[in-house]
Regions:
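Bacterial N-terminal signal peptides
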Residues: 1-4
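Active-site mouth of glycoside hydrolases
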Residues: 13-257, 261-267
Length: 268
């Protein structure tokens, strides 16, 4: 089904923020209630990631955005692949950043906010060898460089709803790990570790240090947009499990809690 763009009027999206009670979102000077409702937009029907085709098949992206808007969405979650946005540990890809800027303008014209989820490594074959070889400190520096570049592009646009630092990050237990990416699901690696070795530190210490470094990177260029990190509610699978990234002593610099539930049909 086609959704012609000519029928869409340019819409002025208002800035969003956490409300004064800290239990929801509002937008604009009147603090109108905002309830995010939308789609994950991470791959097409053949499994291609957005960056695989957004340069050559822009009309497809525009049509998809129009369709999502027509279906009642007000927000779209975009998954940015680190390997497409970083050419080297400290060198962002200018072409990818320009295309992200184009996407932000498309979203604004269509009337859709964006959740920009970053640092993705969903296709293992596309993860740069140099990135996989970095030790923890250097890897975090590259991740900070990534977020600085993204924040520079998005800082002045109300289209950005939030920056989601990483999709469902995890840490090792006591045993040292050897792989940054965890298991595969449907040909993709949606989850990655932020360290391979606790090295005598607690999980909370590592999580806090990582969060603070990335939040600081964003805030160097963008003091306004909300920052979060999407996590799995482990307590539903493991009774008694405690939140890590949203523990008070860990996630104090995040703006809101983002928990990923996967309901079945008719269970929303």
């Amino acid at each position: 089904m086609a959704f012609p763009l000519v029928e869409l009027s340019s819409q002025s999206l208002e800035w969003t923020r956490v409300n004064s009670k800290g239990d929801g979102f509002v937008r604009g000077p009147r603090s109108d209630t905002f309830r995010a409702w939308g789609f994950n937009y991470d791959h097409d029907e053949s499994g291609r990631l957005l960056e695989d085709y957004w340069q050559t098949e822009w009309d497809t992206v525009a049509s998809d955005f129009a369709e999502m808007k027509a279906l009642g969405a007000n927000i779209v979650r975009i998954h940015l692949q680190l390997g497409r946005f970083m050419d080297a540990p400290d060198q962002p890809n200018v072409k990818a950043l320009a295309q992200l800027n184009r996407l932000i303008h498309l979203a604004g014209k269509t009337g859709l906010y964006l959740n920009l989820t970053g640092l993705a490594c969903y296709h293992k074959k596309d993860v740069p060898a140099w990135y996989d070889e970095l030790e923890e400190a250097a890897r975090w520096e590259t991740q900070a460089c990534f977020w600085e570049a993204i924040a520079k592009v998005g800082a002045d646009s109300p289209v950005i709803f939030c920056y989601d630092l990483m999709n469902e990050p995890v840490l090792p237990r006591k045993t040292k790990e050897t792989e940054w990416l965890t298991g595969e699901l449907g040909g993709k690696h949606f989850v990655q570790r932020i360290t391979l070795d606790l090295a005598g530190r607690t999980r909370k210490q590592v999580a806090r240090a990582w969060l603070e470094q990335l939040v600081a990177a964003v805030r160097r260029h963008d003091q306004r947009h909300m920052i979060t990190v999407g996590v799995i509610p482990w307590a539903l699978s493991f009774p008694g499990a405690k939140p890590l990234f949203y523990a008070p002593e860990v996630g104090g610099k995040l703006d809101f809690v983002s928990v990923h539930f996967y309901p079945k049909t008719d269970e929303i």
